[in-house]
């Protein structure tokens, strides 16, 4: 807390939308899963303006860093995740209009290597979902599940679903890959967004 200029106090735990973060006054402290992604998100959110959305802004440490010893700090945005599906989609459209001009981060082009992290698992799953041959998308060194009926059924379903996909004509751009986990609602206030989980995919 002191690294981000916060005085000692009794922080309050928050939910999954804040990655299990802790609120101290108007600041939320959260542990990060990936330093590079956390710093990128903070840098983007620091200056990004999206009409009709409340973005959590990064709070830099006393020496100017976005991440300190695996922690980041952001301004608190009130609200809770709610099943307002149309509003989440609308928020995504507005956000992606604003992120359309952002360059592709280098880390989104890198292939995961052992030892794998949770972020790597999602990265590989994303690439498999878009690959022409999803089951061939796993890089060398990927952990394998033991043979089981569930695994065989999963492979069968993936193969079926892959055959139902249709090509998209929309260009790839910087998109938020976890809107339902990061969009907050409170009354009639504009939707809030706690973080940006970056992917390079078509926005529609």
Q: Which stretches of residues belong to each language-model region?
A:
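Active-site acidic catalytic loop and adjacent metal/ATP-binding pocket
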Residues: 17-24, 28-30, 58, 159-203
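ATP-binding pocket architecture of kinase catalytic cores
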Residues: 17-107
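Phosphate-binding glycine-rich loops and adjacent basic patches that engage nucleotide phosphates
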Residues: 1-12, 51-61, 100, 104-120, ...
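A cross-family kinase active-site recognition segment
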Residues: 82-150
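Regulatory N- and C-terminal appendages and interdomain linkers associated
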Residues: 1-12, 33-36, 40-43, 47-51, ...
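Hydrophobic, well-ordered secondary-structure segments
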Residues: 85-92, 155-158, 176
């Amino acid at each position: 807390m002191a690294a981000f200029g916060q005085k000692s106090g009794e922080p309050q735990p928050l939910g999954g939308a804040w990655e299990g973060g802790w609120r101290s006054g108007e600041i939320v402290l959260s542990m990060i899963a990936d330093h590079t992604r956390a710093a990128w998100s903070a840098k983007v959110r620091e200056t990004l303006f999206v009409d009709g959305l409340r973005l959590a802004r990064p709070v830099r440490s006393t020496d100017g860093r976005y991440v300190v010893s695996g922690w980041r700090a952001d301004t608190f945005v009130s609200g809770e995740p709610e099943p307002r599906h149309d509003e989440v989609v609308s928020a995504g459209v507005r956000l992606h209009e604003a992120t359309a001009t952002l360059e592709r981060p280098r880390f989104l082009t890198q292939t995961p290597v052992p030892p794998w992290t949770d972020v790597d698992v999602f990265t590989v799953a994303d690439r498999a979902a878009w690959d022409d041959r999803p089951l061939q998308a796993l890089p060398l060194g990927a952990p394998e599940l033991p043979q089981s009926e569930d695994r065989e059924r999963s492979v069968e379903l993936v193969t079926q679903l892959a055959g139902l996909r249709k090509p998209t004509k929309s260009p790839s751009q910087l998109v938020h890959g976890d809107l339902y986990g990061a969009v907050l609602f409170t009354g009639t206030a504009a939707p809030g967004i706690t973080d940006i989980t970056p992917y390079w995919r078509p926005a529609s």
